[in-house]
Amino acid sequence: MALTFDEGPSGATKQILQVLKEKGVTATFFLSGDAVEASSATAKAIVDAGCEIGSNSYSDDSLKGQDREAVREQITKGTDAIKSATGVKTMLLRAPYAAFDEQNWIDAMDLVSAVVSWNIDSGDWLLNGADEQVSTVLD
């Protein structure tokens, strides 16, 4: 099992890192480049905590249906922002909304080593409170 977060970085990132530390586990955080630029110290804290970083593109907009140049720009700007803030050159991508089609892969295959998705979704942006989220994940 792997823990992954589509997590800004945002105000919740430090709390997530603290819980991971207390439990003795790490996770992979998929960050958008614009959020990294706004919170580079938090992005660096993720790496310093021993967690892996992947990109969620630059602006977290859907890549599906975008032309080759737009896809490549979103990926490149996202990974460049992450490298600038953390020193890590990532080639992991979690496409926003899991929207990454065969043409996107062809257009970006030299920029991305793997496109990571998920198989259990906490629905955290839809649910009210931790108890409801835990129930959703465990059910």
Question: Language-model features: where?
Answer:
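Active-site beta->alpha N-cap acidic-glycine motif
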Residues: 1-66, 70-84, 90
